[in-house]
Amino acid sequence: MIRIPRGTQDILPEDSSKWRYIENQLDKLMKLYNYKEIRTPIFESTDLFARGVGDSTDVVQKEMYTFKDKGDRSITLRPEGTAAVVRSYIENKMQGIPNQPVKLYYNGPMFRYERKQKGRYRQFTQFGVEAIGAENPSMDAEVLAMVMHIYESFGLKHLKLVINSIGDADSRKEYNEALIRHFEPVIDTFCDDCKSRLHTNPMRILDCKIDRDKEAVKNAPRITDYLNDDSKAYFNEVKTHLDDLGISYVEDPNLVRGLDYYTHTAFELMMDNPNYDGAITTLCGGGRYNGLLELLDGPNQTGIGFALSIERLLLALEEEGIELDVEDTFDLFIVTMGEEAERYSVKLLNQLRKSGIKADKDYLQRKVKGQMKQADRLNAQYTVVIGDQELENEVIDVKDMSTGETETINLNNLVNYFQEKNN
C-alpha cells in the first residue's frame, strides 16, 4: 500500500470544514483592514529565496525542497510567503498603482524539510499579510492589532505578544560587531550552526535551539543598547500606539526573527496557557523589512507583515477546548420507495440544488428505515418520503428531524417551501 509522505497529512471531510471556516473568517477580517488577496506560484526560482530569505538561514541551508527542472533551472517549492509576494510586487510594478500602501494577504501551502513534531509539517498551510509602501509606526501598530484581532476572534485568550526592535541597517551593523566580539572567545563551545553564523548572521545565535541557554547567550549584548536615535524613536512610537490601543505586550531584546530581511519592529505571538503542554510556543511571527525590495532588485520601498500556520491555529483551538461554529447540516434528505419515486427523485434533486437548497438522497437501495438512519447520520434538517402514493396524490409530508413534527405540502411546492425557509 502506498502511504502518505512523511511530514504531510490528509485533511479529511470531518476536518476540512474547520479549515474552510477558518479561511472564511480570515477573508472577512482582511476586508475590515482593506487587504486584498494575492496568489503566487507554489514554486519559484531558488535564487529568490537564497537572496530574499538569506543564504545563512536554516530555511535556505537545510529546509528547502529544491530541484532542477527540464530546462536545468534551479526551482524551489516555496518555504515561506513574503519573498514571493515581494517578487510579485516588483515584477508587476505595484509601486505605481494609485492605492498606496499596497495591502496584500495570501493563504496556501508552504514546504520545509523539518523534523516531524506536533504542529509542524513538511507541507503546511501559511496565512500571511504584507503591507508595502509605508514606513510609519502606525502601520506597524495596525499589523500588530490585526494579529491580536485574528486570534481573539476565534476565542483564544491565553496569548502573549512579544516585541523587539532590530533597528535600522546602521544599528544592526554596530550590534552585529558587538556580538562577534562577545561570542568569539567562546564560540568553540557552541554548535556548528552557531559557529558558521558568527560572521554571517551573529544575531541568529541568540535563538539557537541548542545553545540558547548558555550563559554567553544570556549575557550577550542587547540590541536595545545599540539602537540609534532614529530607531529608538520609531520603536517608542510603535509602543505608544499599542498602549493607546490597549494591546498588552512584552519586550524581549533577544527576539530575532529567523529570516535575514527583518529591520526595526519584530514580533511573535506566543501561547501563554499554564495548562498548555508546550508542544508549540509560537503561533505567529513577523516584522518590518526595509531593505528586502532593493535586495530583490526592486524600488526603495518598505514593508511589514506576518505569517501564521493554520495547523498551529487549529492545534491551539483544540488545546483550549474551543469548538468552531462549523455548519455541518444540510436542508433535505429524500427517502424513496419504488422505481418511479427513485426516477422522480433525480429530477427533484436537480431542481432543489439549482434553487440553492442543500439536498441528497439514497444511492444504495436501502429500505426506508435504513434511509432514515442515513438522513440522521448526515444531520439532515428535514426528510421527505416519496412513493407511488405521494406521486399519485402530489402530496408529501415534510418531517423536521430535530422535533419529529411533520407538515403536509403539495409536492410541486417543495422547492418554494424550502426557498422560503432559507430566506
Swiss-Prot record:
Origin: domain of life: Bacteria
Subunit structure as annotated in this protein's UniProt entry: Homodimer.
Cellular localisation: Cytoplasm
Main subcellular location: cytoplasm
GO cellular component, one term: cytoplasm
Pfam families attached to this UniProt entry: HGTP_anticodon (PF03129), tRNA-synt_His (PF13393)
Enzyme Commission number(s) of this protein: 6.1.1.21
Descriptive protein name: Histidine--tRNA ligase
SUPFAM superfamilies (alphabetical): Class II aaRS ABD-related, Class II aaRS and biotin synthetases
Family from the record: Belongs to the class-II aminoacyl-tRNA synthetase family.
InterPro entries (alphabetical): aa-tRNA-synth_II, aa-tRNA-synth_II/BPL/LPL, Anticodon-bd, Anticodon-bd_dom_sf, His-tRNA-ligase, HisRS-like_core, HisRS/HisZ, HisRS_anticodon
GO MF assignments: ATP binding; catalytic activity, acting on a protein; histidine-tRNA ligase activity; transferase activity
Catalytic activity: tRNA(His) + L-histidine + ATP = L-histidyl-tRNA(His) + AMP + diphosphate + H(+)
Keywords assigned: Aminoacyl-tRNA synthetase, ATP-binding, Cytoplasm, Ligase, Nucleotide-binding, Protein biosynthesis
Gene Ontology terms: biological process: histidyl-tRNA aminoacylation
